[in-house]
């Protein structure tokens, strides 16, 4: 499937997801869609809690563990702090990678694609989408472009999702 066709299909699915009123169902659907879009083994969508200066995720594929990370810590925290997309072909070779999440979840991260999600004003990062372990290789430029397109679309929704705890 060509990138434009795949992007169109993903954006259409995002449109269907947008009518979901249940926050947990929306986040689960978003996590699944992101994972399918870039052929990742696992995906996590973090919400930025600016008051506590941390990232929060309760909905991550195949884990019931709530995840909280300080902004600036790990690759997801780095993306939230800098607003930069991070594509890492070997997670354990990158000094920014936080191995503690793998230890807590029992998951082994090989490679990562981490994309900041900007709020509707385009000035504040409101979330981070993190894709882990591209099937059959490392994440490529077209994966990054597609995940960035998803992030741009969901930003206005994520900025209105309350952070728990």
Where do the model's predicted regions map?
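Signal-transducing coupling segments at domain and membrane junctions
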Residues: 54-56, 89-111, 133
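A short, aliphatic-rich beta-strand micro-motif
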Residues: 110-120
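Short beta-strand-to-loop transition segments that serve as allosteric relay/switch motifs
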Residues: 128-137
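GAF sensory/regulatory domain recognition
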Residues: 32-35, 42-67, 71
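Allosteric cytosolic regulatory segments
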Residues: 144, 148-156
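Acidic/proline- and glycine-rich, intrinsically disordered low-complexity segments
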Residues: 64-86
